[in-house]
Each structure stands twice: as structure tokens, then as C-alpha cells.
């Protein structure tokens, strides 16, 4: 092997090593990003976000606790389940003892539909409670609602994405990305024809992107 060939081999080897290093770094960054997202999500599942309380003093813990206690009394919830609370921009974040309690708060809020008047605030506006979610989940929820309401009555954030269902008795679909949204939007016929659901599963491969919960 002459000197020229050796130089070519060395250059090729360096290029291969650099490519391998770049791929490893990229994989590590992706893995770390996924772990951070999971940690962020796990940290939020036992919390709720409360929007709409028309009071400029919500950064004060005593004021927050006053309203949290009022909400608990109105919705038949237990204030002892509240571990801590904070104020973030335009809403209260209440950390509860577990994810089950967070879902309970959201469910009872939907059933009662509180208003500021219920909290002795002279303002005609709703107070809404949601299970806490990441910015990414909230964006997916907004896109799903914009595209699928009113064809699907129930649209809400869940563990694996956004839950979509026609009514209380219909099947549940989990939307994980915009492709899922477009598929359901194109097939909104199924939102009104429950007897056609079986065909929905076998029509083509694209619906396999949707996770169906039985």
C-alpha cells in the first residue's frame, strides 16, 4: 500500500469515526429529550390547572387557598388532597396527592361548570379546571378540538395523547399527532354511524396510527 492509499484510508476512517460519533450524540440527545418529556409529564399528572378566576391577587397563597377551599366545597372535593399550589401567568396550579384526584377535579368541574359568581366574585365568567398538561399536549388538544368539534362530543387530554369519542357509549380513539387528526376529520362519518365502526378498522392501514381503547 503506497502513501497515497494510506492517506485515503486515514481520511476515510476519520470520516467514519466522525459520522459514528455524530449519530451517537444525536441518539443520546433524542433519548434525553424523550426522558425529560416523560419526567415533565409524570410531574404534571397529579396536578390541575384552574383558569378563569377573576382576581388579581392569586399570587398570594392565602388568596389561592381561599378559592381552592371554595371550589372543594362547591364540587364536593377534599381540600386535604391539595399538597401545594402556585400561580402561573393566568391560572392556578394545584398539586394533588395523586393522578386519580386530578381527574376527579376535572370531571366534577365539567359536571358543575363553575362561574366566578359561585366564588362570590362579581364577574360573569366561567371557572375551568383541567388536568395539568405540557405545552405540547395543549397544542395538540387545541388542534384536535378545532378540527373535530362538533363531530366528536368528548375531546380531552389523556395519558397517551388526546382522547376523542363521539358520545358516552362510543369507542375511544387516542390522537397522538396531526396525521391522526386528519384521518378522523376525513372519516367524521363514523362519529354519527356507530354501526359502521367495524369497517373503520379494516378500511385501510392509516387508521392503525390510532390507538383504540376497548
Curated annotation (Swiss-Prot):
It holds the Pfam family Baculo_FP_2nd. This protein is missing from baculovirus FP (few polyhedra) mutants. Interacts with IE0. This is Protein FP25.
Amino acid at each position: 500500500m503506497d502513501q497515497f492509499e494510506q492517506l485515503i484510508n486515514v481520511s476515510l476512517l476519520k470520516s467514519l469515526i466522525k459520522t459514528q460519533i455524530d449519530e451517537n450524540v444525536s441518539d443520546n440527545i433524542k433519548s434525553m429529550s424523550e426522558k425529560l418529556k416523560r419526567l415533565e409529564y409524570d410531574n404534571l399528572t397529579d396536578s390541575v390547572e384552574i383558569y378563569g378566576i377573576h382576581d388579581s391577587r392569586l399570587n398570594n397563597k392565602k388568596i389561592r387557598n381561599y378559592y381552592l377551599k371554595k371550589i372543594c366545597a362547591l364540587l364536593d372535593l377534599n381540600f386535604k388532597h391539595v399538597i401545594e399550589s402556585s400561580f402561573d401567568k393566568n391560572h392556578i396550579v394545584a398539586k394533588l396527592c395523586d393522578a386519580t384526584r386530578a381527574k376527579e377535579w376535572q370531571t366534577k368541574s365539567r359536571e358543575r361548570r363553575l362561574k366566578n359568581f359561585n366564588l362570590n366574585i362579581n364577574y360573569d365568567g366561567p371557572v375551568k379546571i383541567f388536568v395539568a398538561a405540557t405545552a405540547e399536549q395543549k397544542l395538540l388538544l387545541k388542534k384536535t378540538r378545532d378540527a373535530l368539534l362538533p363531530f366528536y362530543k368528548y375531546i380531552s387530554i389523556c395519558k397517551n395523547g388526546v382522547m376523542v369519542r363521539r358520545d358516552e357509549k362510543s369507542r375511544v380513539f387516542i390522537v397522538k399527532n396531526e396525521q391522526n387528526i386528519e384521518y378522523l376529520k376525513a372519516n367524521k362519518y363514523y362519529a354519527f354511524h356507530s354501526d359502521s365502526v367495524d369497517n373503520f378498522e379494516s378500511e385501510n392501514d392509516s387508521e392503525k396510527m390510532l390507538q383504540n381503547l376497548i
